[in-house]
Amino acid sequence: MNRLLSLFQLCDSNFPSGSFSHSFGLETYIQEKVITDKESFKNAISVYIRKQLFFTEGLACILAYEAMEKNEPSALVELDHILFASNVAQETRSGNQRMGERMAKLCVDLYPSPILIEYTNRIKEKKAYGHSAIVFAIVAYHLKVTKETAVGAYLFANVSALVQNAVRGIPIGQTDGQRILVEIQPLLEEGVRTISQLPKEDLGAVSPGMEIAQMRHERLNVRLFMS
């Protein structure tokens, strides 16, 4: 139980990783009136989950966990570099880097482990960029949480943060936000099964539409979010 409670802490949208500052391109769709209410946001976030989250952070999280199972810590830095290089939008790329660096610093204090200390040192030495998916996987492995639970929790944490940002950005009501989190759970369960079967070569295979929205975000006249 204590292990799960520790993992829940990382999934809390109040965990100060900086995720509250990022919409990952969804703000572009809000300003263009593609997203206007609960249903349009739910549709958009479902596309984001299926076409981007599964193939980037979700797959990286499970690959990082498997690398530690195989005692291949050097693979974590390789994954870190692939995640950074495959992120086309500058705002999203730098946002993920800042969030990863911040999360690594917090977790090395809260849940220290030799692997996390080494990864954090690599970030400090500029030999790694930092990414929350890798930090989350390291902490989950250290806590001896199962691989499937780890990736499911990581997907939920990402979606929960985006829903909270939608409450502010669209806006939608808090109750509608919680309804989305309930309604989206079958998709996240599907995601765990899907990601478990993806090869490493699929890492970064995302929808260009989402990437274009993330790049266009840089030129919006008014922005609530950093990406």
UniProtKB/Swiss-Prot annotation:
Keyword annotations: Chaperone, Cytoplasm, Nickel insertion
Superkingdom assignment: Bacteria
Quaternary state and interactors: UreD, UreF and UreG form a complex that acts as a GTP-hydrolysis-dependent molecular chaperone, activating the urease apoprotein by helping to assemble the nickel containing metallocenter of UreC. The UreE protein probably delivers the nickel.
GO MF annotation list: nickel cation binding
InterPro entries per UniProt: UreF, UreF_sf
Name assigned to this protein: Urease accessory protein UreF
Annotated organism of origin: Bacillus sp. (strain TB-90)
General function of this protein: Required for maturation of urease via the functional incorporation of the urease nickel metallocenter.
Family to which the UniProt record says this protein belongs: Belongs to the UreF family.
Disulfide bond positions: none
GO CC annotations, alphabetized: cytoplasm
Cross-referenced HAMAP family: UreF
Places the protein is found: Cytoplasm
